[in-house]
Amino acid sequence: MLVGVCDFPGSYAFPPAGYGGIERWLWAVAVGARAAGADVHLLGPGWLTDLEHDWVRKPVRLEDISTGSLAERELRDTGYDLLVVGHEYPSIPAWTRTWNELDCDVATFQHSPVFQHTGTAFDGQRSRLYCYSPEMIERYADHQPIPELAVHLGLDEEEPPATAGTELVWLGRIDEEKAPHIAVRAAQILGRRIRIVGPVFDEAYVRRHERLFSADHVKWIGELGGPAKTAAIADASVFVYTYARPYVEAGAAVFGESLRAGTPMAALTWREGTCAHAALCDETGAVAVVDPREEDETAARRLADAIEQAESLDHQRVQAIGMQRFDPVRHFQAMSARSC
């Protein structure tokens, strides 16, 4: 099988060493495809030039190719079986025009809870959309979505053998939507230290919760990538996951990252059918489902209970399950096969 993994214009490198959910997913698919025995071409100028030593890198984007051009003919003659792309592309006319000339499948994963696809973007066979959670399946029901847990990998982020850490960790972008202040309060209730890892996206949000964020039990780490990011997760006793009431998580990378590192998770959710429910089980974490009408303090106390529950789990067992559940080879094989 010949697979093309397409980049897109953005602020992160391909592959990124840290953040960038779609970029990390595309890299995981490329890694999984090659490990599964497929031939892989990295398509687009965004892929790191250093990869040319080990990968076939072609700096071409389908949406930039003219009808009847030599570039179109060369792409068609290459004979791709599958293209893997960011979720917007099957709804972009310039991209789909070129793709239709190639006689191959396309697969993508929905990383946004709000993007509106065209009515003809997916048929469930030649063009396939994959979604992480029951919540996302319901949101995109008109496009014949297929349930699947996304795998996200970064460059040089190989996980060490699992060990039981000591401090709590929260990782992600720091803003209102991700609501780390609830994790900080839950840690405070338990008398535990918590490390906050990630870039600040909203300074006003941080100022609103300054008393919590400046408390003695909070350690600000900043944005990490590569081995340092992996170590921050692996060295924790529990990964604490939060988000705001109205926010819909399309396919959080942190579930796979934490479980693959052997760190159990304590997740706060405001409804059933979320990514946390799809990703976790009793052996890998604890999910606190809180009525969104409840106050933050109630949510923090429920989350604190979940942290204590998750802390009793076996880290080596968590890692074993995580490596299987979020295996890039399994993920690629699921996405490369048409439904029966």
Task: Identify the role of each PLM range.
Residues 62, 293-340:
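A charged, aromatic-enriched C-terminal amphipathic alpha-helix characteristic of glycosyltransferases
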Residues 130, 146-197:
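Conserved donor-binding/catalytic core segment of Leloir-type glycosyltransferases
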Residues 105-116, 125-159:
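Donor nucleotide-sugar binding/catalytic pocket of nucleotide-sugar-dependent glycosyltransferases
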